[in-house]
Swiss-Prot record:
In the eye, it is highly expressed within the lens, particularly in the anterior lens epithelium and in a ring corresponding to the equatorial region where anterior cells are differentiating into lens fibers. Also highly expressed in the retina. Residues 532-558, 591-614 are annotated as: Disordered. The modification Phosphoserine is found at residues 83, 379, 536, 579, 581, 590, 664. Belongs to the Rab3-GAP catalytic subunit family. InterPro entries: Rab3GAP1, Rab3GAP1_C, Rab3GAP1_conserved. This is Rab3 GTPase-activating protein catalytic subunit. Keywords: Cytoplasm, Endoplasmic reticulum, Golgi apparatus, GTPase activation, Phosphoprotein. It comes from the Eukaryota.
């Protein structure tokens, strides 16, 4: 019984072979990726066109897999092509070898100038690469390499994928790949050798042919012919007789008068070093066979001059120093500084002298002014010394800018200062009529900068140049200090600021430009007021405010009236001017109180008989047709105050105040009153000019659409016109009615000023004085970028480079978006400057190449045009073919460049090296050689032979070799028949 029970007690161990190992899971993941990308089964594309590897579109897609805890990235690289016709495709797929094997023999795209390294080495249009995901990871051991190769071989066999699959091994900088491609009964193995030092027997064609033949091991005799493609690359680094001519501008020479002060308005341009560092000449023999050429360790038939194909590429200098880019970059750096002008210069910029006088004046101002201005006031009375005296005081020996430079800049900014007295109105330019040749004149609208002939624009250029060449930040602070003092001097002495458009501030420009325009408006108003006082005191007939009604009546007619009505339709430009101001505009006349009394008593009724007895004042001219409804007197257009000009910050401030009033009835009423200051002023002027008038009379002139006339028949049967106010004018508590009832008959010259030029000018001057250099740079940076873009466009027009035109359009579009924001980000500004520098470098490269190839020295127009096209292609394309190779016009020039460089190198050789070079004949040969030893030797060997057996299918074999000073690489693709071996 015991014996019988023993077998039953035994436990059998069962091995489950369905449990996948890490290796099997890895293979499964590779297959899964290939399936997802639909790389299963045969694929056949169109024959490769010449140059398609460079001109075509390459795309890639990636995924990530892992082998245990080691991560790999899988990337599919492929050339985008149209799929062939379905019928043709089905015919060709029968018994066809994989597409990649056919590509090994294609000669249309040997040595592509820009392509993936595997494309260059093997001529493939599609392939998959498995590489370690982390940059630092590497597959180093031979066993791991073999494991990965086994994995991809199994995955290709299981899926039927005919796309080559590569594995990257060793460190990534070595670019070492092993791979495989499988087809029906065929297989191609991709192998590679990478050495730092090349064995001497493999430096020439004969040695490489030996390797190729031994590798394919063809048993046939004679061996099928081997097709050979050879490329030798020569590098030219020494540009003899073509020194880079660009020199930084000499500011001292400019100030000394050699060039002239106007050079301060021009930005520099160009590279400080040659932006072309090397020229690479590739001499190619695309179709050779083994028997027609000799290249061994003793003799070579490979003469570059006799090569049938030449191509050239240029190597650009890395980040060449460019003047324009440096100028703008340095100016941008000021925006990041935090020091004030006083801190930089180490003294108070606007310190006052004569404290006793200042204190007395301040005391008087307290007595005469009802409310102080809520800013530190630099009033005219406090300016005991003129701005010019202050300039002399502040300009000491320690000043960052010497007097010659400063005077040259100030004369450039203020050309009217050449005469003893600045010109009057002629100093202000009219930007509304740009020069017809200035097609880019309106570019400032897009950049929110300033017109290119304006003072603000010139100031930006001068500050940019001073920052770069004269004192940096201190020089900028010094010039700004002098500029602000000049502004005050002009305000005090009624001298208009040159280089600014007349009229209200242009909100399309930068805020600083608007502030200067506002100051100019103040000077104009002050000047007109002062002249008006003089003429009224002398009883001149050319008074600015004529009181005699009959002198100008009916002169301008109905057209002028319509313009005036349109102008008067705008209501309430300044809330600030409505409030009780400490500044009074009216003159202290003896009958003012009587006038007020009459006005208050009669204002409520609108136009009573008592008002008709008042003397008319402030008439501009008689209206062409209209008469007063009440008494039939002619209607006179009054002299009115102009609305207050405003800058964008004042408009924003006004909007905030109006918004804070809320939506209540009281707030809305107060808002309406604040906005009706201009309307109230015009009503008072109208009442003063037309005693006995009614609201209807005012509306007929001021807003004709609100007075409705219709034809009616009177009692006698006559058709007459009868008019009445519009519906909106009849609304109870109408703002117009309220304003009319409160308006008094006061002419414009006696009214409180809508625009207090004294206060506004002081606010502007205070604003300018408080600007730090960083604030100033922020204001002016749009002008500097604007100037840089104009400079780039000007320089490009001389060269006519298509790619540069495209980049300039991108710069303008980008800048327009960025600069319209109040405080653009530094990163976005740096991007714009980088684009400008890129364009500058491209133009500098074009000029460098034109100088080297001597385009201006060509005697024949055809040769010149051909060279210019050649230079343009060198800038646009990675590699350019030389028409006629060494025998063409461009080829002869390139040959001459190499000859000159060789001769210069031979002269520079020391005697010891000449002695070492051997016999005199060898020395002579070395010196006479037109070209240096090739910097790179590339060979492609191809053959179609049966492998591994004589009866195997004839399949493509290929080996690529590259030899440089640094390394030696062999990349072989060897196909074999897996059915008949």
């Amino acid at each position: 019984m015991a014996a019988d029970s023993e077998p039953e007690s035994e436990v059998f161990e069962i091995t489950d072979f369905t449990t996948a190992s890490e290796w099997e899971r890895f293979i499964s993941k590779v297959e899964e990726v290939l399936n997802d990308w639909k790389l299963i089964g045969p694929s056949l594309g169109k024959p490769l066109e010449k140059g398609i590897f460079t001109s075509g579109t390459w795309e890639e897609r990636s995924d990530e897999i892992s082998f245990a805890d080691f991560r790999f990235s899988v990337t599919h690289h492929y050339l985008v092509q149209e799929s062939p016709d379905k019928e043709r495709k089905d015919e060709e797929l029968e018994d066809a070898i994989p597409q990649s094997m056919q590509d090994l023999l294609c000669m249309n795209n040997d040595f592509p100038p820009r392509a993936h390294c595997l494309v260059r080495w093997y001529g493939l249009r599609e392939f998959v690469v498995i590489a370690p995901a982390a940059h630092s990871d590497a597959v180093l051991s031979e066993s791991k390499c073999n494991l990965l190769l086994s994995s991809i071989s199994i995955a290709l066999g299981n899926t039927g994928c005919q796309v080559p699959l590569f594995v990257q091994i060793h460190h990534k900088w070595r670019r070492m790949y092993m791979g495989e491609c499988q087809g029906p009964g065929v297989r191609t193995d991709f192998e590679m050798v990478h050495l730092r030092k090349v064995p001497s027997q493999y430096t020439h064609l004969s040695g490489l042919l030996d390797i190729f033949k031994s590798k394919i091991g063809c048993p046939l005799t004679p061996l099928p012919p081997v097709s050979i493609a050879i490329r030798l690359t020569y590098v030219l680094q020494d540009w003899q007789q073509y020194f880079w001519p660009q020199q930084p501008p000499d500011i001292d020479a400019l100030v000394g008068g050699e060039v002239g002060g106007l050079e301060f308005g021009k930005l520099p341009f160009g590279a400080c070093e040659d932006p072309i560092s090397e020229l690479h000449l590739a001499t190619t023999w695309p179709h050779l066979t083994e028997g027609i050429i000799v290249d061994n360790d003793v003799y070579s038939d490979l003469d570059p001059v006799q090569a049938p194909h030449w191509s050239v590429r240029v190597r650009k200098a890395d980040n060449p120093q460019c003047l324009l880019g440096d100028f703008v970059t340095e100016f941008l750096k000021i925006c990041r500084r935090k020091e004030s002008t006083d801190e930089i210069l180490g003294r108070s910029t606007f310190e006052e002298e004569g404290r006793e006088v200042a204190d007395i004046t301040h005391a008087l101002s307290k007595l005469t002014e009802p409310a102080p201005v809520p800013i530190h006031k630099l009033s005219v009375s406090n300016m005991v010394h003129t701005a010019k005296k202050k300039i002399r005081k502040h300009r000491g020996e320690e000043s960052p800018l010497n007097s010659d430079v400063l005077n040259t800049i100030l004369l450039f900014l203020f050309p009217d200062a050449v005469s003893e007295k600045p010109l009057d109105g002629t100093t202000s330019i009219d930007n509304s009529i740009p020069a017809p040749e200035a097609g880019d004149y309106t570019l400032y609208n897009q950049f929110k900068s300033a017109p290119s002939d304006s003072l603000t624009y010139k100031l930006a250029l001068c500050l940019c140049m001073i920052n770069f060449y004269h004192g940096g930040l201190k020089g900028v602070a010094h010039l700004w200090q002098e500029f602000v003092l000049e502004m005050r001097f002009r305000w005090e002495n009624n001298f208009l600021i040159p280089g600014l458009a007349s009229g209200s501030p242009d909100l399309r420009c930068c805020l600083l430009h608007q502030k200067l325009q506002m100051l100019n408006c103040c000077i104009e108003r002050k000047k007109a007021r002062d002249e008006g006082k003089k003429t009224s005191l002398s009883d001149s007939t050319t008074s600015a405010y004529p009181g005699d009604a009959g002198k100008t009546g009916g002169q301008l007619g109905l057209d002028h009236l319509r313009d005036t009505e349109k102008e008067k339709g705008e209501v309430g430009k300044s809330w600030d001017s409505w409030s009780d101001s400490e500044e009074e505009f009216f003159e202290c006349l003896s009958d003012t109180e009587d006038l007020k009394g009459n006005g208050q008593e009669s204002g409520k009724k609108g136009g009573p008989k008592e008002m008709a007895n008042l003397k008319p004042e402030g008439r501009l001219h008689q209206h062409g047709k209209l008469t007063l409804l009440h008494n039939g007197e002619p209607l006179y257009i009054p002299v009115t105050q102009e609305p207050a000009p405003m800058t964008e910050d004042l408009l924003e401030e006004q909007s905030e105040v109006l918004a804070k009033l809320g939506t209540s009835a009281e707030g809305a009423h107060l808002r309406a009153r604040m906005q009706s200051a201009c309307l109230l002023s015009d009503m008072e002027s109208f009442k003063a000019a037309n005693p006995g008038c009614f609201l209807e009379d005012f509306v007929r002139w001021y807003s004709p659409r609100d007075y409705i006339e219709e034809e009616v028949t009177d009692e006698k049967g006559n058709v007459v016109l009868k008019g009445e106010l519009s519906a909106r004018m009849k609304i109870p508590s109408n703002m117009w009615v309220e304003a009319w009832e409160t308006a008094k008959p006061v002419p414009a010259r006696r009214q409180r000023r809508l625009f207090d030029d004294t206060r506004e000018a002081e606010k502007v001057l205070h604003y300018l004085a408080m600007q730090k250099p960083a604030d100033l740079a922020r204001h002016l940076l749009p002008c500097v970028i604007h100037a840089a873009v104009l400079k780039v466009k000007e320089e490009e027009s001389l060269e006519n480079i298509p790619s540069v035109k495209k980049i300039i359009k991108q710069i303008i579009a980008h800048s327009s978006k960025v600069l319209h924001f109040p405080n653009p980000e530094d990163k976005k500004l740096e991007e714009i400057i980088l684009q400008i520098t890129t364009v500058e470098a491209i133009i500098a490269r074009a000029r460098s190449l034109k100088a080297k190839f001597g385009t201006e020295k060509c005697e024949h127009e055809e040769e010149k045009e051909g060279l210019e096209r050649f230079v343009s292609c060198l800038l646009e394309q990675p590699e350019v073919s030389v028409t006629g190779a060494g025998r063409g016009h461009a080829g002869r020039i390139i040959h001459k460049l190499f000859v000159n460089a060789q001769r210069a190198a031979a002269v520079a050789l020391p005697e010891e090296e000449l002695k070492k070079s051997g016999c005199p004949e060898e020395r002579r040969q070395t010196l006479v050689s037109d070209f240096p030893p090739p910097a790179g030797r590339e060979l492609i060997l191809r053959a179609t032979v049966p492998r591994p057996a004589p009866y195997s299918k004839a399949l493509p074999q290929r080996m690529y070799s590259v030899l440089t000073k640094e390394d030696f690489r062999l990349a072989g693709a060897f196909s074999s028949d897996t059915s008949f071996f």
